[in-house]
Amino acid sequence: MKKAILLCASIGWQTIYDEKGRPKARHIGVSVSWMPYEISYKRCGFNHLISAEYANLMQREPQRIEMMVDHIARCFASAAAKLMEQHHAEPSDMSEACEELRRGLLEGFRSFLENDKIWIHHFNQVLNVPKGSRYRAEDGEWYEAEEDAMIVVHCGAGEQMMTQAEYERMKQKEDKK
């Protein structure tokens, strides 16, 4: 079973306007994006709004942060499952991505509620592509891997196919920075 690839999560203030364009309410907007590898390299996402009143409760009662994070992780799993169903694709294993999202959002909500600054987290992912296996490239075409390789997914920067050795060199450069 393949995995859904988590790309990005963000938390920030979002103003809701009435039909005349006047500010009506201020909410916290949570945005989550991912890539359903089984379908293609198409990015998917959803937004979740939290009222300012509930945000105040979350500040006073930290256990509400965990409740909200669990709720958003369930929304993510549900949205991804519905998408797979629509495309008649094998369901993704969401457990790893949900756990990663939970960890990121717990940190994010604490940071956002303490500092009142927008929080954004990019999840870089690595997919192993064994020699001979087929993969779908960004152009939507299917290709066969000519050697053991990996696809490194950088949120916002696209995807990059590379060999294990190239990946190790890239990681060493990043670790030195």
What are these language model-derived features?
Residues 176-177:
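Short acidic DE-rich linear segments
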